[in-house]
């Protein structure tokens, strides 16, 4: 399950980070370190990786291979949810791991105070081996690389039931968002629930709104928002919120939208109870727990959508990337870089095979067992634009405010104004 920090929790964590003892760690803004040979001996060196409940198995096999190759000892600690807040609280008190899974977006790198807390990964030896479209897609703050992308980042788009489409004569994805809504109306008229929303768990309510911003994002919407030249009350955002509400009021969503859960949404799409959902990669992970690759390939498809065409929105999460902390111990810091170099170098082919995940490297093929929908998600990355989480300097509670709108507790205008107020508070706390 995907979780997001609330604005209140993130604001508290930002204040903690800002108030942490500057003498507890190394000086800020150190340059990149040397990159050791990936299999250089590390007998007696102990490293710690912090991971969330949904990422703690990701490094298991590659870490084991690294230990055998180098003699190092690597411990994987599972940090309780809310993961990001728990880490920020511990980091603020000087409790640092060697590496951690971390959302590699500008806002979350800012939240962890990357320039003073994280090692620079500039000059990493595997970067040139990555698919050119992915090299600089995330993990960079103010021109410095702080995060190593290890798995394909999530994309906001539409997952659909292929069998429902076929039964109703839909032979190709709609050409744009307006045609998507028209398709929803057609399906509703034929007795199908067009879209399914999980308003009870709330966090996915933002996806139908964000995809409507893709064209504006191409024109610099998030950058303008960061500079105060646009806001969450700007017409493009307010219109997207109103359109979402209009689709709900028109009956294009499930009747239990206010209480439906993440699990309900997965069940509805797999069974054909609903035709489509706006979602990200973690949703497909749920489906993989319900069906094997053959059934998924027969049943579930994916397409990106935007006002003018098929443009997705990138939203990398913590399971996609790792950061290396500046612990003040030069040996461990170098060993952490060495582990990343091993992981993304000679250990990468075995890693993607073990995880049955899409390869990020041009010279490493994706495993045969990766479902087609995930390959389609990955293929959409080169033409995708950044989400709010990826490019805004702060991430307010848009999803909570939208869920409140679904429950009749907010108007679109109140959603926009409340979200803007939260954004300004968070940006100020982050020093932006």
Model-inferred region functions:
Residues 93, 168, 250, 289-354:
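Extracytoplasmic/periplasmic substrate-recognition and gating elements
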Residues 227-257:
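Glycine-centered hinge/linker elements that transmit conformational signals in sensory
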Residues 1-46, 424-432:
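Short, low-complexity disordered leader/linker segments with a strong preference
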């Amino acid at each position: 399950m995907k979780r997001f920090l609330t604005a209140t929790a993130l604001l508290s964590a930002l204040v903690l980070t800002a108030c942490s003892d500057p003498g507890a760690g190394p000086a800020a803004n150190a340059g990149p370190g040397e990159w050791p040979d990936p299999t250089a001996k590390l007998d007696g060196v102990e490293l710690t990786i912090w991971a969330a409940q949904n990422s703690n198995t990701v490094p298991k096999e590659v870490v084991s291979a690294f230990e055998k190759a180098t003699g190092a000892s690597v411990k994987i600690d599972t940090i309780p949810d809310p993961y990001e807040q728990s880490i920020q609280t511990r980091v603020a008190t000087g409790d640092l791991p060697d590496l951690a899974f971390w959302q590699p977006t500008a806002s979350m790198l800012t939240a962890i105070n990357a320039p003073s807390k994280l090692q620079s990964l500039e000059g990493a030896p595997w970067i040139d081996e990555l698919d050119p479209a992915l090299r600089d897609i995330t993990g960079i703050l103010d021109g410095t690389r702080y995060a190593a992308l290890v798995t394909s980042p999530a994309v906001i788009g539409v997952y659909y039931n292929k069998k429902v489409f076929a039964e109703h004569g839909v032979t190709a994805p709609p050409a744009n968002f307006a045609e998507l809504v028209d398709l929803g109306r057609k399906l509703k008229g034929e007795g199908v629930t067009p879209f399914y929303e999980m308003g009870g768990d709330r966090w996915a309510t933002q996806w139908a709104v964000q995809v409507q911003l893709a064209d504006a994002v191409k024109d610099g919407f998030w950058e303008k928002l960061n500079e105060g030249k646009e806001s969450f009350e700007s017409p493009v955002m307010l219109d997207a919120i109103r359109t979402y509400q209009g689709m709900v009021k028109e009956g294009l969503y499930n009747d239990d939208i206010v209480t439906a859960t993440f699990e309900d949404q997965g069940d509805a799409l797999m069974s054909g109870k609903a035709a489509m959902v706006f979602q990200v990669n973690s949703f497909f992970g749920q489906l993989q727990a319900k069906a094997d690759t053959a059934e998924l390939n027969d049943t579930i498809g994916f397409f990106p959508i935007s006002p003018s065409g098929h443009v997705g929105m990138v939203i990398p999460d913590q399971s996609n990337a790792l950061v290396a902390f500046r612990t003040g111990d030069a040996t461990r810091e170098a060993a952490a870089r060495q582990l990343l170099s091993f992981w993304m170098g000679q250990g990468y082919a075995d890693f993607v095979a073990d995880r049955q995940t899409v390869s990020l490297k041009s010279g490493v093929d994706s495993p045969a067992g990766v479902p087609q929908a995930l390959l389609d998600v990955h293929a959409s990355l080169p033409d995708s634009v950044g989400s709010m989480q990826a490019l805004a300097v702060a991430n307010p509670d848009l999803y909570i405010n939208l869920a409140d709108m679904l429950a009749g507790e907010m108007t679109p205008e109140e959603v926009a104004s409340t979200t803007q107020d939260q954004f300004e508070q968070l940006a100020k706390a982050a020093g932006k």
